[in-house]
Amino acid sequence: MLNLAQLQSQTRELLAALKQLTEHCPSAVDGTTEGMIPGLSPWSTTGESGEATRARETVLKCLAKLQVSLAGPIDVLQHMASQTQLLACLQWLGEFQVPACIPLDGSASIKDVAELIGVPENHICRIVRMAITAGFLQEPELGHVAHSPLSAAFVTNPSYLDAAMFLARITTPAALNMPSITRQRTAGMCERVNQVEQNNNIINMVTSSTLDETALPRLERQWYAYLRFGTGNLCDTATDIISCLNSFQGTSATVVEVGARSLDRAMTLANRYPTLRFIIQIHLPSSASGSGKDEAKYDRTRAIRSHSQITVQYRTPGTPQQIQDAAVYIINFPLPFPGVSSCSISAQLETELRAHLQALRLSPAATLVLTAPALPERGARGTEVAVLTRIRDLSFLQLANDREPEISELINLLNGVGDSEGRFVVVKK
């Protein structure tokens, strides 16, 4: 329980953060729309890339700290009940594509929406009004529904809805099934092959479909969206760690990004370093692995029209790196996939590192960058990353019986990869 001094300290911290936020988001204070992005909160502006972002995150952190400090058992239970119902409502709205039926500007009759999707009007009213309690949608007048800034963002950026649907369909059922999975593993059923079967059962139970060519790509897309937006896994998009490219500014050096799951990082870096050549290697879709016919379909290289210096090609994970004259190799941290991954993250990473030994031997000046998540050491505390780290850790446990290696383990792994002619050396972390 907070004492008076602690409460006053946290209150001052919150007020200071709020002051910073209002200074960086004037349009949200005076009610103007200048600088606002459609589908975003008025506190999010086109310039929210630095101080404004940090100020908003600080406000949310302070509020969360106060809530944890002041909440009692009843508050916690009511909050969990609310979040459960909100997730159920969001899944329902997504299943029936309700957000897409509502114009981004203006409103729609709830009766018309109900007729369009074929559900009772009273049913959709009850769901919409629960969602409104969290700022998702709004009812400008009785019987009409309109987008709020929050719900509009789920339309303008479908990845948010992908993350929410995976959370509802896959993550939550698996999390609630954790006691029975623990009992099975404790009883000696912890072999990875059994875990893969369990994961397939979880996914098939929730999706009512097998992991075929149609279902698997969608599931992969939703899984990666959930990891990015639901667990704070930003390894695939972070660019601030790629400081080694500064020395190649103005040259025509080649940069290879291995295991990319999106083009976000490549496009950001291409804009920052317009003379560099970027080769983006995407892993073969899981549905194509092991099938010669399907693999041939992906055996091609394509250019990105908007960025002439970016080319994309497919590559099977762990195969020897064929681009042997690059200045920099960016290795994306491998991620498990429920029901598909057959070896641990550490094993996948070691295989990928060994696949690059020959390329680095031929180009001794080349640099290899591993984009690892910000996983704290055991016992380390930090409210900024601790919650998301624990969410991600449990998601890996429940869905793939895996975990992220700690920083010390990664360094030991890197130092241990080599052959008779040399080994990796960590020069910066």
UniProtKB/Swiss-Prot annotation:
Biotechnology: Secalonic acids show unprecedented anticancer activities against various human cancer cells and might be interesting for further derivatization, targeting diseases such as cancer.
InterPro entries: SAM-dependent_MTases_sf (IPR029063), WH-like_DNA-bd_sf (IPR036388), WH_DNA-bd_sf (IPR036390)
Record feature DNA-binding region, as residue ranges: 110-129
Domain of life: Eukaryota
HTH iclR-type domain ranges (all copies): 80-144
Keywords: DNA-binding, Nucleus, Transcription, Transcription regulation
Gene Ontology CC terms: nucleus
Entry's Gene Ontology molecular function annotations: DNA binding
Subcellular localization(s) per the UniProt record: Nucleus
Chain's role: Transcriptional coactivator; part of the gene cluster that mediates the biosynthesis of the tetrahydroxanthone dimer secalonic acid D.
Name of this chain's protein: Transcriptional coactivator AacuS
Organism field: Aspergillus aculeatus (strain ATCC 16872 / CBS 172.66 / WB 5094)
Gene: AacuS
